[in-house]
A protein has these predicted regions:
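Acidic/polar loop patches that form or flank catalytic/metal-binding clefts of enzymes
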Residues: 33-43, 75-79, 163-169, 191-192
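Active-site lining segments that contact anionic ligands and/or coordinate catalytic metals
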Residues: 51-53, 72, 125-129, 209
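Active-site neighborhood of glycoside hydrolase catalytic domains
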Residues: 1-55, 59-72
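Substrate-binding cleft of secreted/luminal carbohydrate-active enzymes
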Residues: 79-89, 100-173
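Extracytoplasmic/secreted proteins, especially bacterial periplasmic and envelope-associated proteins
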Residues: 20-23, 27, 148, 152, ...
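Low-complexity, disordered linker/stalk regions enriched in Pro/Thr/Ser/Gly
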Residues: 180-214
């Protein structure tokens, strides 16, 4: 009824419902701006067009953040494939606390680069930072919150404050034990997968031997 009353029509780009969403967000933004506040929301806000001063949190990959930055809107990068800490830290899910799914090892978190190369230097100025998300539908205790966050939070910190040319995962691993000592002092519950020994087995059919790479 509201769509009809406002005379909103869909087109090839967006549905009428998406345009109604944009209308509501723009109305809400004006109210908040009048109170000295700014609006911020997930990248679904792009559907139907953004309100003028919106800040976008890009969680469905990076495309929403890229689109918003090209429109000169502030962006916080939060792609689920790199920064959703409610994903499992190990593939051995049978021995892990229950999680929503997915797989996000600390190495992948560390590898994230929040400045898309598809943006110009001027457009990159609208990327204000990154954010990890930890939804707690499957997390009943604060101790498990710590487990899901640590030490992935340390990798997130370096994503934010280290320039790409200076990032070095091997060096990060060398420094991590010092931080883990702090975790121990405060009795934080942290995951230890990063310290596991990973072995690759390569059979040699010619002589029946087995190469093991650690």
């Amino acid at each position: 009824a509201r769509i009809k009353a406002l005379g909103i029509k869909g087109d090839k780009k967006h549905s009428a419902e998406a345009y109604l969403q944009s209308f509501i967000i723009t109305h809400a933004e004006k109210f908040l701006n009048d109170k000295g506040r700014q609006i911020i929301g997930w990248d679904e806000m792009l559907e139907g067009g953004l309100a003028p001063n919106s800040t976008v949190m890009s969680w469905r990959g990076e495309s929403g953040g890229i689109e918003a930055a090209k429109q000169h809107h502030d962006v916080i990068m939060s792609p689920n494939t790199y920064l959703y800490f409610d994903y499992y830290q190990s593939k051995d899910v049978e021995n892990e606390p229950e999680a929503i799914g997915g797989y996000l090892p600390i190495e992948r978190v560390y590898s994230y680069e929040p400045m898309p190369k598809s943006l110009t230097p001027e457009e990159q100025k609208y990327i204000k930072g990154v954010q990890a998300n930890l939804w707690t539908e499957y997390i009943p205790t604060f101790s498990q919150v710590e487990y899901m966050e640590l030490p992935r939070m340390a990798a997130l910190a370096e994503v934010q404050w280290t320039m790409p040319a200076k990032k070095n995962y091997e060096d990060f691993l060398k420094r991590l034990p010092g931080l883990v000592d702090v975790y121990d002092v405060y009795k934080y519950n942290y995951a230890t997968h990063v310290f596991d020994v990973n072995a690759v087995f390569t059979p040699n059919p010619q002589d029946g031997t087995l190469d093991v790479t650690l």
